[in-house]
């Protein structure tokens, strides 16, 4: 059951005391259990840049909602906590996960390692761009960013430094938060080399599959990217990896909607 932490309880009809938060989601566990589901996939919960959206509607600036522009890979999003105390989001998330587990529901995190909130070469400096731009991002010979994510940049995932960061991040969420699995957004970028070319045996994907601390977690690939690479049924990794099937999803959605074109595309 895929859900957005804020959106799932933000409306008053949810009936929770703490809408739009980890605590609010915890209040809805009986509802989730009644549905008979055995796992929830939380859309991105890492700290992200909510002000990256520069558009305005009726004179009010819109904010980033979905969470796919990560700023802090090791930190839960502070705006998802119900507590007034500072730095309580970690404890609140741990309590949510523990309660879900006690009710027989696993927790899978939607993680975004294909790009960051630093945008293109003209974007803001939050972290990696200032640490070592040449290491962390895929760059063209002219020094511009490869944009296989559609968000301005692409992480250089198979560089040893970046690979280690991703491994440490996943270990962190596995060991300290006890999550059960990860769904990797635009996972095909994780298999590109420093020139942006697809690799037959990407070091990162192999490391994730055989890392001892990750041996019991589920690994799920969204096996395509915005650069035209589509690898459903042919994702270059160990058999431990499962895949999202975008074409099947779209076909079923078209069928259920009665959309003949989408169901047959």
Kindly give the residue locations of the regions a language model identified.
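Substrate-binding/active-site clefts of carbohydrate-active enzymes
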Residues: 4-20, 30-179, 186-210, 229
